[in-house]
A protein has these predicted regions:
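Conserved SAM/AdoMet-binding glycine-rich loop
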Residues: 173
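Binuclear metal-dependent hydrolase catalytic cores
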Residues: 1-170, 178-181, 192-193, 252-283
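Cap/insert and terminal regions of metallo-dependent hydrolase folds
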Residues: 168, 176-271, 276
């Protein structure tokens, strides 16, 4: 049974616009999984979620589920502009890790306090239900989910998702693969085990190899690191994601070409794509 994966936002850190980024797009992270018999499942609530809401229109969203990887701005800043939440009859459950210094619900609510936003969280027509997840596996309607703690400042989860008839899918945003932050070699081994056998991996490719030494510990990876990880995991498809806001379309094309050259040497069967706003894949 086909599962449709749609990319609504693929930039990291801050949304961008203009002719230099028109093909890749400039919205921050938001993806959806759609499958017959399963509720709409959303991954992250960056500014891309606004376009998702516009596609739903004035209809309420019933039984929707939103997985938050972490609460940095670029992954939650679109939530106030998700129009279904302003329509009666919408039901949305938000699931994500507990941040280090507050509850998940309080962080989502605080970004809509009066000092920074005109309308409070409580005034959504149908305020979402918020549930905190641990790193233990759990089930959502339609999917089995295995979280994994990523190498990124704060508490950040990647999600491996499976369902009958769908190749295992892994969403690995905001993740530093090289040395940095506070994780060890055993963490990297665990990441490889967690990804093993995943058919499609969406992975952070924020930085270029040339600029990485100055950004160690910031919690992001390069396309070449992502290719090597996907090759080691035996993946069929790698989607490069979380593009640097300073990277124009031509630079994204060059990054992709270099990544494909590396993949041809490391894992000839690995398909490498670069995410762009509006990309649709089938799992």
């Amino acid at each position: 049974m086909t599962v449709t994966l749609t990319f609504w936002g693929t930039r990291g850190s801050i949304p961008v616009s203009g002719p230099a980024t028109a093909r890749t797009g400039g919205s921050t992270p938001c993806l959806t999984l759609e499958a017959a018999g399963a509720p709409l499942t959303i991954l992250d609530a960056g500014t891309g979620i606004r376009a998702l809401g516009a596609s739903i229109g004035n209809r309420p969203l019933t039984g929707g589920q939103l997985l938050i990887s972490h609460t940095h701005w670029d992954h939650i800043q679109g939530l106030p502009f998700f129009t279904p939440l302003w329509h009666q009859g919408t039901s949305l459950t938000i699931v994500g890790p507990r941040p280090e210094h507050a509850s998940l619900a309080s962080v989502l609510e605080r970004q809509m306090e009066a000092d920074v936003f005109p309308v409070p969280f409580a005034q959504f027509a149908e305020p979402p239900r918020v549930r905190e997840a641990t790193a233990e596996p759990f089930d959502l309607p339609g999917y089995s989910v295995r979280p994994f703690r990523l190498n990124h400042p704060g508490v950040t989860f990647g999600y491996r998702m499976e369902r009958p008839g769908m190749g295992a899918f892994a969403y690995v945003t905001d993740n530093e693969l090289g040395p940095g932050h506070h994780f060890t070699t055993s963490w990297r081994d665990g990441l490889g085990d967690w990804l093993s056998g995943a058919q499609t991996i969406v992975h952070d490719s924020m930085y270029l190899d040339s600029g990485l030494p100055q950004r160690r510990g910031w919690g992001h990876s390069t396309a070449s690191e992502a290719v090597n990880l996907a090759a080691d995991a035996g993946a069929v498809r790698l989607v490069l994601f979380h593009h640097d806001p300073e990277r124009g379309d031509d630079a994204v094309d060059a990054m992709l070409a270099s990544a494909r050259e590396l993949a041809a040497r490391r894992a000839p069967g690995l398909e490498v794509l670069s995410a762009h706003d509006g990309l649709v894949l089938h799992l």
